[in-house]
Amino acid sequence: MKESIKLKLESLSDRYDELAALLGVAEVIMDQDLFRAYSKEYAELEPVVKCFNEFQQIDENIAEAELMMTDADPDIKEMGVEEYKAGLAQKEELQLVLQKLLLPKDPNDSRNVFLEVRAGTGGDEASIFSGDLFRMYSRYAETQRWKVEIVSASDGEHGGYKEVIARIVGEGAYSKLKFESGAHRVQRVPATESQGRIHTSACTVAVMPEMDEVDDIIINKSDLRIDTFRASGAGGQHVNKTDSAIRLTHIPTGVVVECQEERSQHKNRAKAMSLLASRLQAAELEKAASEQSETRKSLVGSGDRSERIRTYNYPQGRVTDHRINLTLYKLDEIVAGELDSLINPLVNEFQAEQLAALSGDN
């Protein structure tokens, strides 16, 4: 292990012990904000420190095995060789785990997300496919025990959506879904196709971390144009009685958001403000990523919504993620919400990129 990494781990271990002591101090316990901040930091450090302690114990075991290897008794010597080999293998494995734990954390990973799915090329079939994608993400959210709230939706003429925007609430939602942004392509025979020909359609997906307008991004009220209108769609007689739907226009950037799913204008406005903050933040992040990509192109994490990232081929039952050349012949399971078989390899690839960069920096 590099000396710089070892010193970093020792420093984190000292901080962990310090926090353990602080969390027992009466003044800290009385200060809820401070107690919460220390508790969060302590919880984040715990897996790193535990792994480092295990790593140090293995180092001690290896040293003991080396002593056994010098023993005159051949049985003890043989046992020492076996323990030495096992210790080295464990040490190498733990070293990789520790390096991953030390990778810079995305501050947005624990946030809720706004998910946008839009029909692209392909007409009605693209709208139907956008409905399939939204259902896929909704089912995946169920498996993660996340909550899905539709913010706005524009139905397709023959099913699905021209556009659907949803808020997904749950721990780690962004960390799991952030690599889904991009163009998703489908190849299949549409239900409306009488000749049995395979058509290609596409949808774009955008995943944005939910921003707290107050804490994360400042929006001047003077920069907003606020319009109210009557909600369309489900809702019974209520939709014809009040202008509960909200449209916000951010004048400096031209970004427009709508929310009409809640019956209360106040709730629609709050959701629209949150979505607007996330859109503005996403635009800033996209700009920064674009500038950064001129020096170093990230294979997985670019998040460019125009980039073709995945193809769903129904006749072959195949899903291909083009960023990491991963092909899985389990389309039915994936569109039913079993996304981890795609998400986990993407996360692993992204971490491998980070590790390579970390090695280069050191």
Swiss-Prot record:
<keyword id="KW-0488">Methylation</keyword>
<keyword id="KW-0963">Cytoplasm</keyword>
<dbReference type="GO" id="GO:0005737">
    <property type="term" value="C:cytoplasm"/>
</dbReference>
<dbReference type="InterPro" id="IPR045853">
    <property type="entry name" value="Pep_chain_release_fac_I_sf"/>
</dbReference>
<comment type="similarity">
    <text>Belongs to the prokaryotic/mitochondrial release factor family.</text>
</comment>
<comment type="function">
    <text>Peptide chain release factor 1 directs the termination of translation in response to the peptide chain termination codons UAG and UAA.</text>
</comment>
<dbReference type="InterPro" id="IPR004373">
    <property type="entry name" value="RF-1"/>
</dbReference>
<keyword id="KW-0648">Protein biosynthesis</keyword>
<feature type="modified residue" description="N5-methylglutamine">
    <location>
        <position position="237"/>
    </location>
</feature>
<dbReference type="Pfam" id="PF00472">
    <property type="entry name" value="RF-1"/>
</dbReference>
<dbReference type="GO" id="GO:0016149">
    <property type="term" value="F:translation release factor activity, codon specific"/>
</dbReference>
<dbReference type="Pfam" id="PF03462">
    <property type="entry name" value="PCRF"/>
</dbReference>
<dbReference type="InterPro" id="IPR050057">
    <property type="entry name" value="Prokaryotic/Mito_RF"/>
</dbReference>
<dbReference type="InterPro" id="IPR005139">
    <property type="entry name" value="PCRF"/>
</dbReference>
<dbReference type="InterPro" id="IPR000352">
    <property type="entry name" value="Pep_chain_release_fac_I"/>
</dbReference>
<protein>
    <recommendedName>
        <fullName>Peptide chain release factor 1</fullName>
    </recommendedName>
</protein>
